[in-house]
Amino acid sequence: MESILDAINEWIKKILIGAINGNLSTMFGDVNEKVGTIAAEVGKTPQGWNANIFSMIQNLSENVIVPIAGLVITYVLCYELISMVTEKNNMHDVDTFLFFKWFFKAFVAVFLVTHTFDITMAVFDMAQHIVSGAAGVIGGDTNIDVTEALAAMQEGLKDMEIPELLLLVMETSLVSLCMKIMSVLITVILYGRMIEIYAYCSVSPIPFATMTNREWGQIGNNYLKGLFALGFQGFLIMICVGIYAVLVGEMVLADNLHSAIFSLAAYTVILCFSLFKSGALAKSIFNAH
């Protein structure tokens, strides 16, 4: 009779350990997949992320926003000419060089507006180069060996009794569900960043039209700061992901499985919070408003 109970006990333990291993394998697999997904998504340029959206944004910018930017240039250049002429002793000390300077500013303003997309895409090409370099350094050191991690836990699982294994099954199931929710939030953050980039690029001719004016130029300067901040945000996201993966990799070796499971959940929440804050941090670095 006792041998039958022992056999049933071992059978139940095997089922529970199998469920725990399945949950842990899914969680660690999700970590590896999410690290790779974030690196791939952040490293894409606006052209590479979705060609159809990029084409639509470019057409809107060239056909709708550029004419408005032309009106802005006209106003800015007229204001600039009036200011340049009148500031010299009410037109008594007018120098012909002023007109040369005005024509040069007009040329630069028109050039910037007509080449807006080339300039904005150059910013994100540079950002892609930085992110790709970071992904090469970070990605090679953060991949978790799922098989090795599970093998290291097997002895500890076999020593546990059924109640503790049941508790661990519930914990791993709960944390696995939380990981799925966090994964959705991370996807929302990444897609939200790209949509913000497209929206930012769509109106780029207007701030570029103001850059040659001393007073209005702050609009264009702040726009450029924001543009660089959006590009640099990808690098900050890669740093957050790298730190997260290293923390998870060290957590796998923890002796207490219960604390390790909830540490994984805590690290994932911290990752989401860090990704949310990466945009504000990038803007503060570039002093963009």
PLM region spans:
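Membrane-embedded alpha-helices of multi-pass transport/permease systems
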Residues: 75, 120-123, 127, 185-188, ...
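Membrane-water interface regions at transmembrane-helix termini and the short interhelical loops
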Residues: 81-94, 183-187, 215-216
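Gly/Ser-rich, low-complexity
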Residues: 1-72, 88-97, 107-178, 217, ...
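Alpha-helical transmembrane segments of helical membrane proteins, especially in multi-pass transport
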Residues: 175, 179-211, 225-246
